[in-house]
């Protein structure tokens, strides 16, 4: 039996994707639409207060293409807090005009593939804590996609030795380091939580960097032989004070 990688786990993560039912929203009176937006703004401004206490974070993006219109990403210390947020969001009047298109449940994760030997408690290391309990960068653009490590008769990631996986992940990580300062990456583990094994969330002020890093990593052995991917979502940041314009119908 191959040795399983150990993980450090941080905040729980919930990506929620919605399409706006513009046809139904268009039929609502303007004063009702204004009230819907005000209620939504108030809700999201309230959930964002966790930033000041460093007990979570969130990000809101306008997704490009027909897979979704909105992405709401929430990070919290407990899974049940994500349940509460989702339930309360579904009770908002705007929810009657939003169609869920996708969601992803996971937890911020760091593996021990590239970790050095140390006797210290990793959860007390400031650098590790900043990655497990992050302050999101709120860059102009976001990219999210789920992924698996392939396991079939020809290529099975889970049958490789720890040493083989460490070597592959080292080479994989060296490509990522080339994009330091251009892309901020968050890996969330989802084995037992969702249909894929990991979620990858990328932030950048230059949307083209997403294409560059994903394409370059296609030639990396870790990805070429063992990577399997779900749908990609990309979008531009939207602030709550921009909702009036976003939901405006002339």
Swiss-Prot record:
Reactions this protein catalyses: Fe-coproporphyrin III + 2 H2O2 + 2 H(+) = heme b + 2 CO2 + 4 H2O; Fe-coproporphyrin III + H2O2 + H(+) = harderoheme III + CO2 + 2 H2O; harderoheme III + H2O2 + H(+) = heme b + CO2 + 2 H2O
Entries under SUPFAM superfamilies matching the protein: Dimeric alpha+beta barrel (SSF54909)
Record keywords: Heme, Heme biosynthesis, Iron, Metal-binding, Oxidoreductase
Catalytic residues of the enzyme: 145
Cross-referenced NCBIfam families: PRK12276.1
EC code: 1.3.98.5
Binding site for Fe-coproporphyrin III: 131, 145-149, 172, 185
Transferase is among the record's keywords: no
Cofactor binding note of this UniProt entry: Fe-coproporphyrin III acts both as a substrate and a redox cofactor.
Pathway this chain belongs to: Porphyrin-containing compound metabolism; protoheme biosynthesis
Function of the molecule: Involved in coproporphyrin-dependent heme b biosynthesis. Catalyzes the decarboxylation of Fe-coproporphyrin III (coproheme) to heme b (protoheme IX), the last step of the pathway. The reaction occurs in a stepwise manner with a three-propionate intermediate.
GO MF assignments: heme binding; metal ion binding; oxidoreductase activity, acting on the CH-CH group of donors, oxygen as acceptor; peroxidase activity
Enzyme class: oxidoreductase
Family (UniProt): Belongs to the ChdC family. Type 1 subfamily.
Top-rank taxon: Bacteria
Lineage: Bacteria, Bacillati, Bacillota, Bacilli, Bacillales
Any single biological process term in GO: heme B biosynthetic process
Name of the protein in its database record: Coproheme decarboxylase
Cofactor dependence: Fe-coproporphyrin III
């Amino acid at each position: 039996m191959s040795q399983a990688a150990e993980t450090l786990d941080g905040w729980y993560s919930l990506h929620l994707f919605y399409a706006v039912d513009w046809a139904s929203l268009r039929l609502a009176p303007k004063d009702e639409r204004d009230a819907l937006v005000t209620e939504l703004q108030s809700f999201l401004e309230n959930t964002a207060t966790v930033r000041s206490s460093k007990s979570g974070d969130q990000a809101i993006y306008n997704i490009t293409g027909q897979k979704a219109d909105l992405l709401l990403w929430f990070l919290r210390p407990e899974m049940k807090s994500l349940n509460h947020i989702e339930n309360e969001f579904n009770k908002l009047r705007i929810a009657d005009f939003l169609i869920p298109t996708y969601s992803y449940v996971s937890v911020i994760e760091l593996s021990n593939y590239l970790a050095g030997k140390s006797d210290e408690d990793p959860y007390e290391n400031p650098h590790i804590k900043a990655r497990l309990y992050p302050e999101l960068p709120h860059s102009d653009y976001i990219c999210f996609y789920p992924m698996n490590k392939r396991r079939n008769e020809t290529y099975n990631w889970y049958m490789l030795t720890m040493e083989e996986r460490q070597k592959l992940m080292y080479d994989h990580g060296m490509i990522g380091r080339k994009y330091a300062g251009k892309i901020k990456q968050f890996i969330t583990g989802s084995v037992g939580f969702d249909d894929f094994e990991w979620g990858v969330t990328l932030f950048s002020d230059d949307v083209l960097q997403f294409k560059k890093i994903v394409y370059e990593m296609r030639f990396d052995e870790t990805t070429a032989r063992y990577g399997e991917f779900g749908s990609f979502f990309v979008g531009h940041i939207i602030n709550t004070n921009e909702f009036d314009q976003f939901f405006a119908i002339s």
